Amino acid sequence: RIWAGCIGLSLLLGLSSNPNGTLSLLIPNSISPWSYRSPLEQWRHGRAAIAAIKTIPEHSSVSASTPLIPHLAARAVLIRFPYHTEYTDRKGSDQPVEWIAVDLDYHSRHAKSVAKHRRNLEKIKGELEGLNEEYSPKLVSDGVVILKHDSEPNQEAAEAYLNLLQELPIDQERKT
């Protein structure tokens, strides 16, 4: 009986703590959350993100932000953005990735309330600013940005990209 009670208590505490936000659809983070998105909005954003990454040719090298990686996992070259934008090919040469896919909506959604998301967003913003010369926007859809290496910018995507970057939350720690 004692062991059954201990197991029951550990399951209750483990599931109610919502590890890594995996149960957020079922267990809210709070009664009155600072950022809320309905399941329908989440579904629409997911569909937009998948449609955006489908514009990247299948055999291209990609650097993607964390929420997009599972959808691109079958790629021969897939690295995590913002930590890497270059990879070493089979010949031992360093190569820039052809495409970058970033879900800015995901990273900015909780940036005001969660320090981890705020740090990730700042790192992403800094890296994106440094890539303006090499990469140009090809598509911006519901906060998902697709950038291509050494190509002519899509004017509509470039404008949407600049607007999106300006709308991102500003890091309060840097201003003080």
Give the location of each predicted region.
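C-terminal luminal/periplasmic domains and tails of membrane-associated envelope-modifying transferases
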Residues: 29-71, 76-176
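Signature aromatic-anchored transmembrane alpha helix within multi-pass, membrane-resident enzymes
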Residues: 1-26
